[in-house]
């Protein structure tokens, strides 16, 4: 049989994985190693050479897009029908299983799937029915708790509360939620997998049927599986099924949502004798970029081990730029992209990656000022985000009580006991009397036309808005914004959201405070008060709209969103301690290695050109913060990195000290060797200077604080 069409396009290790005997197999697939091709060719090999029926094959991926691509590529390669083969996501395959056996799974034939929004709405209703205070028992936290328990395979009766009243209450919420779903014939996404797992445990004859059918199981992105997903695959395989898993322990970056990188090691323990094949040849990046990625990830412990390499060129060194602040960082990135475009490159070939969504605001503004179209991948523009629109609506209502849209958005956000029935009365009164909603509330309260509890809640809300308006009227804009976010209850509400999403919302609110501070410094309008001017600015920016999907545009995204993508030119911004690695990872033990894996993912997105940037000072939470450069910069080989200077580019030893040619004369008014005092760092000596005018920078050796580069215009140094 001629199998050249299956093997000729592959390298040696890929061929080894595709043509391996039918046995349990771990393929450690490095970034850019064409693992999808290997999976597709392996499936084709099983059918063509091993004579396996498509009916015996189950292939599991993590996204519907990946599943569709796999089906398409198998069809192209084989040219025959793959009828009977199951290819899909964990949730999709579990859904298919439950539809086929709904009675055995104790589900109605027409059971419906709850999306996240529906799940949240149901939990809000249940928490209210249980007479629980939403502020103390937030529905979003309840959703996180329930989904986390299901991902661990736990029902309410499995949970050990050990007399903990908080745990007991969440357990009751979970129980009430489960009963409500069962009555209505509803399943959420986490329930799909848990119910499918329980189906096999409780109905051995059904499990045996699928074990006999799916004797060839292939799972992609195995490092991203959680406990219930692993248990599902382990149960299906039994003692006779042949499992091929493809994964990369160095790219496990979803621990915050339950992914267990340890599942790769569990596979080796549970399937003794499983062969391991490493795909290390990279078809994406230059040799310099791969050398940096290898050196970075080697600082993690407990790796299964692999080293990426390429037949391609060495390529350019990685560029490293130290910005004065986040504004300078954004300008530098935009200027680099403009140069790329001027040299014939497409904007869509450039990606800006950041650790936190909050970092996008300054970048978005710089791109807008440069009239450069951009697209937020997998997310929304800064001023379109829920928490930002909530905060802006409070500010709008303070500026104008008759803003009905703002009133509607925040009257019950956070929840304050103003029900839909009360709001319907307010709306009807507004329509009948041709009043704004605020005016309608005033009249209804004066007329005592509302029920006692509703009237009290509405009265408190209006008093809150009036008090905020009066007490913050003379405050600087950023102080006013910070006060409104706190006193409105928004900050507390979002702090109660568990996990990465809640943290992101808080960071975005803090970035809004920073935005108002910078606006009050940089924007002047004689005809408007600062708050009104900023609200106009925010509305105009939100109205700009993202670039159309067909339009050539710069790509902005978080590092998590970038996984699986590649771009000719990549910028990773905010490479500072406390930013990346994040402060949360530094505060919580055991998370630093996942941050390093995230950095590794970011570095390996770059095909030709990679630029890393960090800022000496950055406005965070409305304050100027000094961060050290990220430890990840110091872990890169010095021969792979080149530091970008204002006037020249020089090779850089990789350390947190900066090298340069001393300038004896400088128009900043400072001199080499001069003793100075800084408000935060204390006394020090000027050891180097560069730039001129507003870009003049000083390198100062501080006692006990190390060497710092400071912008002369902002440093406020005193001579000693």
Where in the sequence are the language-model features?
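Conserved P-loop NTPase-based nucleic-acid remodeling module centered on helicase motor cores
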Residues: 56-145, 150, 157-162, 321, ...
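Residues at the beta-strand->loop junction immediately N-terminal to the Walker
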Residues: 28-30, 60, 322, 377
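Conserved helicase C-terminal RecA-like lobe
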Residues: 159, 163, 346, 360-372, ...
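Short glycine-/polar-rich loops that comprise or flank the Walker A/P-loop
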Residues: 23, 52-56, 81-84, 239-242, ...
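Walker A/P-loop NTP-binding motif
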Residues: 37-52, 73, 234
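Helicase P-loop NTPase motor core
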Residues: 31-39, 43, 272-275, 280-373, ...
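Conserved helicase NTPase motor core
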Residues: 3, 8-19, 23-28, 38-39, ...
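Structural signature of nuclease core domains in nucleic-acid processing machines
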Residues: 1, 240, 562-579, 584-585, ...
């Amino acid at each position: 049989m001629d199998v050249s069409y299956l093997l000729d396009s592959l390298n040696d290790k890929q061929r080894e994985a595709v043509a391996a005997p039918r046995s349990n197999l771990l393929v450690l697939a490095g970034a850019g190693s064409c693992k999808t091709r290997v999976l597709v060719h392996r499936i084709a090999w099983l059918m063509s050479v091993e004579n396996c029926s498509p009916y015996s094959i189950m292939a599991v991926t993590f996204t519907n897009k990946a599943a569709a691509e796999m089906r398409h590529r198998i069809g192209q390669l084989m040219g025959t029908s793959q009828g009977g083969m199951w290819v899909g996501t964990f949730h999709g395959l579990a859904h298919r299983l439950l539809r086929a056996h709904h009675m055995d799974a104790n589900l109605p034939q027409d059971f419906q799937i709850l999306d996240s929004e529906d799940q949240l709405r149901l939990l809000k209703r249940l928490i209210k029915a249980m007479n629980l205070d939403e502020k103390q028992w937030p529905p979003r936290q309840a959703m996180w708790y329930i989904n986390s328990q299901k991902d661990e395979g736990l029902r309410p009766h499995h949970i050990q509360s050990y007399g903990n009243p908080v745990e007991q209450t969440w357990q009751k919420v979970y129980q009430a939620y489960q009963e409500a779903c069962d009555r209505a014939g509803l399943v959420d996404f986490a329930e799909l997998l848990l119910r499918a797992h329980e189906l096999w445990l409780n109905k051995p004859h059904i499990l045996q049927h699928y074990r006999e059918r799916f004797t060839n199981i292939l799972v992609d992105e195995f490092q991203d599986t959680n406990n219930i997903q692993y248990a599902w695959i382990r149960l299906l395989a039994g003692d006779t099924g042949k499992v091929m898993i493809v994964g990369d322990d160095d790219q496990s970056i979803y621990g915050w949502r339950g992914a267990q990188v340890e599942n790769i090691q569990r596979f080796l323990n549970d399937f003794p004798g499983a062969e391991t094949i490493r795909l290390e040849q990279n078809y994406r990046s230059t040799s310099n970029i791969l050398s940096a990625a290898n050196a970075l990830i080697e600082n993690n412990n407990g790796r299964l081990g692999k080293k990426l390499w390429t037949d391609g060129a060495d390529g350019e060194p990685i560029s490293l730029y130290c910005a004065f602040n986040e504004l300078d960082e954004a300008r530098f990135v935009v200027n680099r992209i403009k140069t790329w475009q001027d040299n014939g490159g497409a904007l869509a070939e450039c990606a800006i990656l950041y650790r936190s969504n909050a970092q996008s605001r300054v970048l978005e503004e710089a791109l807008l000022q440069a009239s450069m179209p951009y697209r937020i991948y997998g997310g929304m523009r800064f001023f379109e985000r829920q928490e930002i629109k909530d905060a802006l609506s409070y500010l709008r209502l303070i500026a104008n009580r008759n803003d009905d849209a703002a009133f509607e958005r925040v009257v019950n956000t956070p929840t304050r006991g103003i029900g839909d029935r009360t709001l319907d009365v307010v709306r009807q009164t507004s329509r009948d009397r041709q009043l704004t909603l605020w005016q309608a509330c005033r009249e209804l309260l004066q007329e005592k036309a509302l029920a006692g509890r509703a009237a009290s809640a509405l009265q408190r809300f209006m008093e809150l808005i009036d008090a905020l308006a009066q007490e913050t009227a003379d405050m600087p804009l950023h102080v006013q914004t910070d006060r409104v976010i706190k006193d409105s209850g928004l900050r507390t509400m979002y702090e109660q959201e568990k996990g990465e999403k809640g943290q992101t919302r808080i960071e975005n609110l803090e970035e809004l405070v920073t935005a108002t501070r910078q606006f009050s410094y940089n924007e002047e309008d004689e005809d408007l008060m600062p708050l009104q001017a900023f609200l106009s600015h925010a509305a105009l920016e939100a109205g700009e709209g993202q670039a159309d999907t067909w339009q050539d545009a710069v790509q902005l995204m978080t590092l998590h969103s970038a996984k699986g993508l590649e771009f000719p030119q990549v910028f990773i911004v905010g490479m500072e301690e406390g930013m990346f690695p994040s402060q949360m990872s530094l505060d919580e033990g055991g998370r630093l290695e996942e941050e390093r894996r995230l950095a590794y993912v970011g570095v390996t997105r770059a095909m030709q050109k990679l630029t890393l940037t960090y800022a000496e000072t950055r406005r965070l939470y409305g304050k100027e913060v000094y961060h050290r450069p990220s430890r990840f910069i110091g872990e890169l080989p010095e021969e792979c990195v080149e530091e970008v200077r204002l006037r020249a580019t020089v090779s850089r030893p990789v350390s947190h000290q900066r090298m340069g040619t001393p300038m004896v004369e400088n128009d900043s008014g400072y001199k080499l060797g001069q003793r100075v005092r800084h408000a935060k760092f204390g006394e020090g000596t000027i050891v180097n200077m560069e730039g001129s005018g507003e870009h003049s920078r000083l390198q100062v050796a501080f006692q006990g604080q190390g060497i710092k580069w400071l912008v002369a215009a902002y440093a406020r140094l005193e001579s000693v």
